[in-house]
């Protein structure tokens, strides 16, 4: 058998001996860092240090190995063994082992010519020319006092009539401080009143929008995330006179900064046949009153009936600082079928997200949606805002808590399961033979394409060549199920 086959299959079945002996930055480590880290860790982005060159990465090599080995970085909260989402950013076991082997070997640089190249990170919109741009009224000043700041900005629409849209895209003005954003919609004028009562630009609000606007939760942004871009015939409607609400979370900074974030609005190219609605599981769906006693870990279980066949597009659990975990799923009437939706075993308020399923996900009529969340209101919770712990109830403030699951959905139609909601992920790009499993057959196909340049079917990293970097990507996906 060709020695390259032996090499590939040996790695695929877990020996890792070649990687342990010969791993270098340019051949093995750079693709991992560029694929998982550099979207945030580069100049002008939220990462506190850049990881763009050998010298930059090597100087933090041991630190990178540690924070990735414990799952702290990259910051992806959903459990990838439970369900998958668009933009999933999780290091595989072979990738983690490669980083460890590289550090153990003394962080060798290797041949710069073997580097597949720095990614092309687009500036401006990631999905095209917007039809409207909603902007903050002025740049928001961050004083540089090392505080986390949560500010809501009211963006009037002033459009004639209801407006059908296919996408909203948050365009941060200053990635040095823009940590994440939440979008909402207000048709009551309440947000404008809160804004008028606050002398600062916008108004401060930690947990949400400062009033009961949860039913108008409209999306979210975190660094590296692609905006939700609905398929043809599917979209949302912004009522005439509505205000778009932009809650910005600004991370701590030691120097004064300013931010002027914009929201790009993309109108539907065709009439909306199915409007996206947001189903909300909240405290009223719980099995017990939403009260968190001090010095106690408390769990809640909420349920919602599914009254029609629906297709899910996105999901976003939401709690505050005392929350520690989430688990959302659907069950059949006889409890013989469970549809996994999202599991977040280690909830982090600062990295909450609006997670898009790879394909529309059907939940049949008669099923039940379940949401389970745990809250640690003890002194052992380092994020507990109360010292000592206090009785905690539902509310908008930092020391309050919430239980919400936001789910975007449409009424189901035949074939929805085949409709992709994001770009093809490497997970399924590596399924070359189309059997929904990344396995030996796919490894052999990649091997047959090894050395190809330009228009290569096995070019997983899109660098116009099939190289060792593609081998490593496939090994990281080996055994994955693309369903």
Name each region found by the language model.
Residues 5-14:
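Sec-dependent N-terminal signal peptides
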Residues 83, 424-483:
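Cellulosome-associated attachment modules in secreted, modular CAZymes
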Residues 1-2:
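N-terminal secretory signal peptides that target proteins for export/translocation
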Residues 18-155, 241-247, 477:
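Aromatic- and Gly/Pro-enriched helix-to-coil junctions and flexible linker segments
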Residues 73-85, 114-311, 316-425:
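Beta-strand-centric surfaces of beta-sandwich/beta-rich domains
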Residues 51, 73, 218-221, 430-432, ...:
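Short clusters of hydrophobic/aromatic residues that line enzyme substrate/ligand-binding pockets
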């Amino acid at each position: 058998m060709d020695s390259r086959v032996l090499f590939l299959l040996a790695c695929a079945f877990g020996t890792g001996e070649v990687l342990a002996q010969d791993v270098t930055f340019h051949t093995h480590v750079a693709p991992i860092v560029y694929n998982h880290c550099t979207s945030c860790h580069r100049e002008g982005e939220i990462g506190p240090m850049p990881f763009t060159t050998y010298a930059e990465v090597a100087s933090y090599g041991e630190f990178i190995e540690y924070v990735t080995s414990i799952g702290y970085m990259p910051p992806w909260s959903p459990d990838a063994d439970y369900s998958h989402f668009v933009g999933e950013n999780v290091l595989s076991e072979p990738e983690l082992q490669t980083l460890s082997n590289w550090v153990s070997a003394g962080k060798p640089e290797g041949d710069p010519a073997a580097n597949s190249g720095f990614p092309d990170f687009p500036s401006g919109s990631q999905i095209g020319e917007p039809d409207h741009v909603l902007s903050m009224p002025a740049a928001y000043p961050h004083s540089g006092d090392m505080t986390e700041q949560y500010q809501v900005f009211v963006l009037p629409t002033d459009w004639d009539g209801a407006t059908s849209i296919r996408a909203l895209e948050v365009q941060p003005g200053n990635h040095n401080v823009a940590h994440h954003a939440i979008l909402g919609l207000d048709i009551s004028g309440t947000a404008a009143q809160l804004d008028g009562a606050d002398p600062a630009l916008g108004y401060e609000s930690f947990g949400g929008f400062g009033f009961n606007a949860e039913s108008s939760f409209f999306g979210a942004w975190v660094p590296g995330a692609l905006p939700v871009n609905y398929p043809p015939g599917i979209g949302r409607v912004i009522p005439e006179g509505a205000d778009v609400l932009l809650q910005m979370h600004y991370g701590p900074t030691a120097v004064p900064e300013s931010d002027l974030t914009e929201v790009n609005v993309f109108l539907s190219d065709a009439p909306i046949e199915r409007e996206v609605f947001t189903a909300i599981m909240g405290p009223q769906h719980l099995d017990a009153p939403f009260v968190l006693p001090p010095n106690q870990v408390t769990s809640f279980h909420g349920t919602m009936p599914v009254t029609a066949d629906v297709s899910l597009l996105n999901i976003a659990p939401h709690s505050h600082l005392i929350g520690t975990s989430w688990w959302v799923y659907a069950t059949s009437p006889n409890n013989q079928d469970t549809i996994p939706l999202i599991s977040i075993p280690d909830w982090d308020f600062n990295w909450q997200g609006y997670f898009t399923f790879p394909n529309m996900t059907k939940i049949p009529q008669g099923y039940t949606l379940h949401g389970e969340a745990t809250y640690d209101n003890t002194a052992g919770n380092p994020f507990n805002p109360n010292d000592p712990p206090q009785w905690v109830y539902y509310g908008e403030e930092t020391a309050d808590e919430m239980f919400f699951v936001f789910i975007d959905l449409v009424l189901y139609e035949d074939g929805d399961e085949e409709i992709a909601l994001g770009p093809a992920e490497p997970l399924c790009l590596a399924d070359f033979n189309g059997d929904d499993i990344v396995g030996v057959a796919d490894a052999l196909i990649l091997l047959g394409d090894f050395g190809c340049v330009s228009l290569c079917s096995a070019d997983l990293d899109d660098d116009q060549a099939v190289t060792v970097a593609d081998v490593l990507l496939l090994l990281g996906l080996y055994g994955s199920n693309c369903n």
